Amino acid sequence: MLTELNLSNNTFVGLIPSFSCINASLVRLLDFSHNHYSGHIPRGLGACSKLKVFRAGFNHLSGPISSDIVNLAKLTNLELYGNKLSGKLPMNIGKLSKLNDLLLDDNSFTGPLPPSLVNCTNLNILILRYNFLEGDISTFNFSSLHQLTVIDLGVNNFFGNLPVSLYSCKSLVALRLSANQLEGQIQPEILQLKLLSFLSLTNNRLTNITNAIKILMRCKALTIVLLGGNFLHEAMPGDDTIVGFNGFENLQVLSFDESQLTGQLPIWLSRLKKLEFLTLDFNRITGSIPGWLSTLPRLFALYLSHNLISGEFPKELCALPTLQSSKALVGNNHLDLPLFNSISNFRYNFLSNMRATIVLANNNLSGSIPVEIGRLKLLDHLDLSHNKFSGSIPNEMSQLTNLEILDLSANQFSGEIPASLSSLHFLNNFSVANNNLHGPIPSGTQLQSFDVSAYEGNLGLCGPPLLDECAHIVFGEFVVHYSLAISGELHISNSWTK
């Protein structure tokens, strides 16, 4: 007698077979996930009276959830994520009182949360991210869902204040309400969630950043705090005492990006000794990059682009411990909810899978790059573009042998491109465009495999992939390099022979 049918992770096409339960009323598990099935969820599914698990995620299913699905009184897992399903969620979904996991993310569902959902009192995981759900979230009563550990309602159209009833879900470990239209302030009642480790409220309309920090720093279990796209045009609180020595004691990821915050990098960040990932991109932060960042023993990703930061690249930044010797200190625990790259939409389930990164692009930084940069041997991504850096590109950059992305474009670098950069064998994204570089692009290396756009805007550069030919004249120990452009214009530079 058939009790389980698992067809997951294949390449099946067509409709999900509607005969699944006609002759198999004792079936307990149906798994059609990760295939290419299309069409609607078959009617007749409600005849599977013993069914506990129904999975059909990552297919091409469309249409509404079939109405008879609420007859599955024993259902514990309903997983239909990553399809093209639409319509409203079943109004009587509360009849699925044994439901543990409801995963309907990445579809096109509309309408409000069904009030009957509060009857799913065994619900453990609720993920409805990336739909078109709407309504005043503050009016939904979460208090009966006391077994919830994960709630993800991100990327929908909910509005209103943060629902106070959420704070009755004492088992809650992860909460994502990002990319909605929520407003108001973070309430102190959130401190009732003693197990809360993951909090993402990005891209809403929250206010009072100072209040938010004062409250959240006391949430002892927090490891991930994502609050970017809120607190628009407020001042980053710089008071050294705002975060005590025990504040944010377990925090690993902190994001306040895309908020147009003013002020400087606050010194209280130096107390976050478990911080691994800090992003403050797209603000109006001024002042210099503080040397105390190097005292954060686990920091491996620093995003400060699109600000008003001035000064030089601090030598102290080259002493970040996790970028020098080992990423052993970086947390390798599975994240309670995945992190998504907003550009690539790449999904990260582990912090250790994220690139070791320093991004300082689009600021007012100046001066030369310190030779100490060669100490950051584990760096994967370095972006210093659109600043006012000058001087030569240091040879020591060739010691960054893990580099996959190096962007030095739109600065005032001069001299030649160091031939030693050819040792950066993992480099797949490179640009020195719009500087004052001259001389030949190192030949016989992968540096010549990049597009012309990686070198444009340097009148003195020559050699492939540029069309400008290289030539040189030797006068004793002095070499004159020149680039003969297609236009016939002569661009001359010089260097000493070795």
Language model regions located:
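Plant-biased, solvent-exposed loop and capping regions
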Residues: 1-498
